Amino acid sequence: MKILCRILSCLATVCITVACSSTAHIVIRDGADYGLTAEFIPSSLLEKNITHLLKQKSEHTDGQSVFNGQELKEAFTKEGISVQDITLQGALGLRFVCTVPQTHELLEDVIGYDKKERKAVLRISPENIVSFLEILPQESRDFIDMLMAPLFTGDAIPPAEYEELIGAAYGKKIAAELRNAEFTLTVDVPYKVQTARISPAGTVTVQTKTEKTSRALIRIPLLELLCTVGMIEVQMQ
């Protein structure tokens, strides 16, 4: 349970930051590898502020990505994950496409799929995220540490207080963007979903793709996600 959520972490983490276009797409299949595609495109304000802070901490140069594509690919490959594409865009932009064996141990605590019962459960928790972050290259972890989010630190901070913390550290404009931002996750499952729910925060809507497949669109307010100290769980049955 390391890389998939590390990605869902790096995305749900990084991406999770503030005003940006961030999406993740998981495809659950019967008898085949699961697919994962994710993309994070930061707002110009976010990239400008984070880049400025990184330049103060290190020898970071304009346009240089905070991620190392080769290191990320090697980390995924080491975990038995097939990487189709990793694209770096500017300093913070990231897009990747990969497939994960459905029996891979990294899926156990993140995605639970019962083929017989036709039920899927997705879980996001601080414990899951921490274990994922440990595998990231140091540079990526340094960037994530700058967010100071309860989801990563385990410290209980109310959303309003965390918003104030971000405002004091990175400016009121970024804090305002964070207040209105969402993380969007699309999940395709190989069965027709009758009921879907998410708790304790967020919304989930279901679309029927075919008579035998469904797609769930999950939206979670970033403030709620970043301040999670318990578990966010999505059930589709």
Where are the language model's segments positioned?
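Bacterial N-terminal signal peptides that target proteins for export
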Residues: 1-8
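A generic structural micro-environment signature
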Residues: 7, 26, 32-34, 195, ...
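Residue-level signal for mature regions of secreted extracellular proteins and peptides
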Residues: 10-13
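C-terminal motif of bacterial Sec signal peptides marking the signal peptidase cleavage site
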Residues: 18-19
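Start-of-domain marker
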Residues: 22-80
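Mature, soluble, non-transmembrane domains
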Residues: 73-237
